[in-house]
Amino acid sequence: MPARRNPTARQVRLGTELRRLREAAGLKATEAAALLGVNSVQMSQIESGIAGVSEQRLRRLAANYACSDDALIDALAAIATDRTRGWWEEYRGVLPAAYQDLAELDHHARFRKDVAVIHVPGLLQTEEYARALFAYMNPEFPDDEVGLRVEHRMRRRVVIDGSDPIPYETVIHEAVLRIRVAGRAASRAQLDRILAVSEADHVTVRVIPFALDDFAGAGSTMVHLGGAVPRLDTVVRDAPHGTAFVDSDAQLEHFRKLFRRVKEAALPPEPSRDLIHQLMKEL
């Protein structure tokens, strides 16, 4: 297959998982290349996501790697053969690649879990709230780029607002709900949006109140996206250099434990809604 100039996060993940399977089998890249009848450069491109791999070749590699996890192999084959061109492709080359990667990961996710301690999670943001955030960025974005970023964020909400939503669970610190990003009216509308979404059967919203003693998780902002199998989960975090996609087994387990701890510290859903109602009355 021809080399890709800019592989997506899912394509890179496929290559990463094939490399991990090869390493677990104790094979060198040159040995894996021989199994497919390609050279070491082509094998390196496959394992870095720069080049694709057919389902037949993927299953041949998995068999030679003695991988007996059929669910994982099927999930990897689904990624390898996926030809979806979603709405996010309209923004490729216009917005940063991470925007398209996150939208694509959302689209394919089996579930999503957020922890928010600074800003309202993107999927819950109103248009006015999102616009205020993007307009405040430093360096400043031109007005047309702010508009594109807001539009992209609003379209991403389809995964919880659309006709085929995914299970969504979020834990939000009270500080997030109190910060007036765009004034009183906008803050009231934002809280109303959170309350409305929280009523859906597939959505669970929990709030960590200021009154909670011994909460040291102020740096816990994260997005956890469920893969077709747990091994293919992805955690998304903001990093100094941009958006970081975390996928090693050890890191994933770390963030699963972190989410459980933060969730346990939060109020149950109904008291969380009561607190949000109270905050609306204060505006």
Regions found by a protein language model. Give the residues of each.
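C-terminal regulatory/effector modules of DNA-binding transcriptional regulators
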Residues: V171, G183-L283
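Interdomain hinge/linker segments and adjacent boundary elements that couple functional modules
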Residues: P2-T16, R20, A24, A29-A34, ...
